[in-house]
Amino acid sequence: SCVDFQTKCKKDSDCCGKLECSSRWKWCVYPSPF
């Protein structure tokens, strides 16, 4: 299973879909467009 937006995570693969695990916040975020 995976975790959704703004849910605590340890690595990118913890997050659903294209979400990434933010190293700053330690939760899943949408990838930066930049």
From Swiss-Prot:
Cystines in this chain: C2-C16, C9-C21, C15-C28
Domain remarks in the Swiss-Prot or TrEMBL record: The presence of a 'disulfide through disulfide knot' structurally defines this protein as a knottin.
Main location: secreted
An example molecular function term from Gene Ontology annotations: ion channel inhibitor activity
Protein name listed in UniProt: U2-theraphotoxin-Bs1a
PROSITE patterns reported for this sequence: HWTX_1 (PS60021)
Tissue and organ expression note: Expressed by the venom gland.
GO cellular component, one term: extracellular region
